[in-house]
């Protein structure tokens, strides 16, 4: 059962985002990017208040995703990535992104905190950061 509302076009949009942000990190990395996106829609907290849909989340400015500025983001959605997007919309969570709202790719080690948000772990090149349950209970 879906944890957020998502039309078929929303699924394709999320699949394109997941591929564009993390294709080099494999399916697991793409699922983690999807977790962050779904959490931003679910959360209604911190930087993501009033983000109520996948398009709102993908195109949020400021605070959105770098991939939307790249031409490869606008390529046709592929079935493989749409299936991954459907999995995260249906509630599949992958550590360290299970409760994360942010990720970035540092040049070195992951910092313990990033803008006062705790590091939940690293997967390949990306570090993930989550709010506290008190600050953002809907992502827990």
Predicted ranges, named:
Residues 2-140:
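Bacterial extracytoplasmic/cell-wall-associated proteins, especially those involved in peptidoglycan
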């Amino acid at each position: 059962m879906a944890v957020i509302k998502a039309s078929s076009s929303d699924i394709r949009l999320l699949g394109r985002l997941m591929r564009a942000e993390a294709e080099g990190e494999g399916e697991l990395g793409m699922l983690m990017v999807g977790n962050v996106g779904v959490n931003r829609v679910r959360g209604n907290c911190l930087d993501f208040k009033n983000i109520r849909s996948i398009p709102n989340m993908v195109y949020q400015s400021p605070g959105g995703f770098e991939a939307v500025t790249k031409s490869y983001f606008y390529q046709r959605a592929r079935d493989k990535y749409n299936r991954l997007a459907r999995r995260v919309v249906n509630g599949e969570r992958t550590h360290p992104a299970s409760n994360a709202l942010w990720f970035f790719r540092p040049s070195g080690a992951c910092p313990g905190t990033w803008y006062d948000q705790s590091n939940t772990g690293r997967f390949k090149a990306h570090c993930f950061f989550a709010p506290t349950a008190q600050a953002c209970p809907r992502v827990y």
